[in-house]
Amino acid sequence: MNSKFIVIEGLEGAGKTTARDTVVAVLRAQGINDIVFTREPGGTPLAEKLRDLIKQGIDGEVLTDKAEVLMLYAARVQLVENVIKPALARGSWVVGDRHDLSSQAYQGGGRGIDSQLMASLRDTVLGEFRPDLTLYLDLPPAVGLARARARGELDRIEQESLAFFERTRARYLELAASDASIKTIDASQPIEQVSASISQALAQWLTNQEPV
């Protein structure tokens, strides 16, 4: 079948790394071995520099919400145009750790940036480019943040309030409910059950794709 762009989304501590491993295992079982991995923000030299600024800040300067979202879209368009689109064009599959849905949820939901502005930014920067499938790993923010804290020091965004992540989750769920290409996975389950749910959702989706 033709190359596809699959994205894994979720709050901090949702288990995106484990989900990626599961996705790769399912794809390889289907004979799909040419896989490119991406992360957002990041994935190109410029985008990685922006990632550091977004996550850590610089010299204590306050990063405004609109500056943050513009930096995210600058990093995203670099990744899409320089990595993702070329990979898809040469027949590779792309598995991404976050994409535009993160901005719609974190900046649109968590930060409260106007949803029309967020949609306009997406459409202006990305045009009609969208993932073929998004796996959204859903879990209560308190659970995810506890997992993130257990990993070590939190970055600038991970230090946001629980209310911020509650708003972010609510926007994720709202967007997932209105888009058939987004599959919601209960990430509060034990890891084995989460992997099984991902495998089932991905396998079912693959059976509905047109062969080459």
Curated annotation (Swiss-Prot):
Q: Which residues cross the membrane?
A: none
Q: Looking at its record, which EC class is this enzyme?
A: transferase
Query: Where is it found, in Gene Ontology cellular component terms?
Result: cytosol
Top-level lineage group: Bacteria
Which EC number(s) does the record attach to this protein?
2.7.4.9
Which amino acids does the record list as binding ATP?
Answer: G10, L11, E12, G13, A14, G15, K16, T17
Q: Name one GO molecular function term.
A: ATP binding
Task: Please cite one Gene Ontology biological process associated with this protein.
Answer: dTDP biosynthetic process
List, alphabetically, the CDD domains matched. Answer: TMPK
The cross-references to SUPFAM superfamilies, in alphabetical order and at most eight, read: P-loop containing nucleoside triphosphate hydrolases
Name the chemical reaction catalysed here: dTMP + ATP = dTDP + ADP
Which UniProt keywords are present, listed alphabetically?
A: ATP-binding, Kinase, Nucleotide biosynthesis, Nucleotide-binding, Transferase
Keyword Cell wall biogenesis/degradation: yes or no? Answer: no
What InterPro entries does this protein's entry cite?
P-loop_NTPase, Thymidylate_kin-like_dom, Thymidylate_kin_CS, Thymidylate_kinase
Tell me the protein family, please: Belongs to the thymidylate kinase family.
This molecule's function is given as: Phosphorylation of dTMP to form dTDP in both de novo and salvage pathways of dTTP synthesis.
Protein name per Swiss-Prot or TrEMBL: Thymidylate kinase
Q: Which organism is it from?
A: Yersinia pseudotuberculosis serotype O:3 (strain YPIII)
